């Protein structure tokens, strides 16, 4: 398990790297979480212990997060998230083969036809043009089961369901091997999350036949759990892999100055 890291700090916000395996917030005594990490960090500097949690990453997900250092900043960031003016981008990887008719199939064929195995689409640190034809939109309705801590795709008629929307594009298609050393294909995705539903990315990609590597809730352990994860969200060979999902970029307006700020993991 990696360690949390401070990426940026000023009088109003703290931007951090959250490693996989650490919860954003937990009720379990003695278990490390990001809230405690920041609270202790501020206490060591003789600062008020306030930590404003305005968004979350699931425990097995690594990535960049922003926390508020005061209530005014927390209110501003929370409002931006509610109004969908923040931008959150993820990298994900799957060894799935996709379901018939999935838009990804065309992307994979394009990579293969051009002998583009192991090639990468450059990702600009500025605002992504998600109107580009390379981007596809997934819209589903998701219901959450608190008893099992899982979600499922359901219908718009389900009164408990919430609309879930994301955009994605294929950024690489490479030869790989599963945990049984069978040859397969690994597909890497760039994802823009437009709504923040429970396990949304994991569930929606699994629903179109691309369960994430390392996902034991919505994937197939036999083909999705070999290798070790990395800070980039990419995966390789070895024992067991972490969940191949990384929140690599977040964009928001500074709560005090209004400046548009972008933070990208290296």
Predicted regions and their residues:
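RNA pseudouridine synthases
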Residues: 1-266
């Amino acid at each position: 398990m990696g360690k949390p890291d401070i990426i940026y700090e000023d009088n109003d916000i703290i931007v951090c790297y959250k490693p996989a395996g650490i919860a954003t917030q937990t009720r379990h005594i003695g278990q490390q979480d990001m809230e405690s990490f920041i609270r202790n960090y501020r206490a060591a500097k003789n600062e008020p212990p306030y930590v404003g949690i305005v968004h979350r990453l699931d425990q097995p997900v690594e990535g960049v997060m922003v926390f508020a250092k005061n209530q005014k900043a927390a209110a501003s960031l929370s409002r931006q998230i509610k109004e969908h003016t923040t931008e959150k981008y993820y990298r994900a990887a799957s060894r799935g083969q996709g379901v018939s008719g999935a838009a990804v199939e065309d992307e994979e064929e394009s990579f293969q036809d051009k002998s583009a195995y192991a090639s990468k689409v450059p990702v600009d640190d500025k605002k992504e043009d998600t109107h580009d034809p390379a981007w596809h939109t997934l819209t589903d309705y998701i219901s959450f089961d608190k008893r099992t801590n899982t979600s499922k795709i359901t219908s718009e008629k389900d009164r408990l369901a919430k609309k879930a929307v994301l955009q994605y594009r294929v950024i690489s298609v490479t030869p790989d091997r599963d945990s049984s050393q069978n040859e397969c294909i690994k597909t890497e995705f760039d994802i823009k999350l437009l709504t923040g539903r429970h396990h949304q990315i994991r569930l929606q990609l699994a629903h179109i036949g691309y369960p994430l590597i390392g996902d034991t809730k919505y994937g197939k352990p036999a083909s999705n759990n070999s290798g070790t994860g990395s800070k980039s969200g990419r995966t390789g060979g070895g024992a067991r892999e972490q969940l191949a999902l990384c929140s690599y970029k977040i964009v928001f307006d500074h709560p005090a100055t209004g400046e548009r700020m972008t933070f990208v993991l290296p």
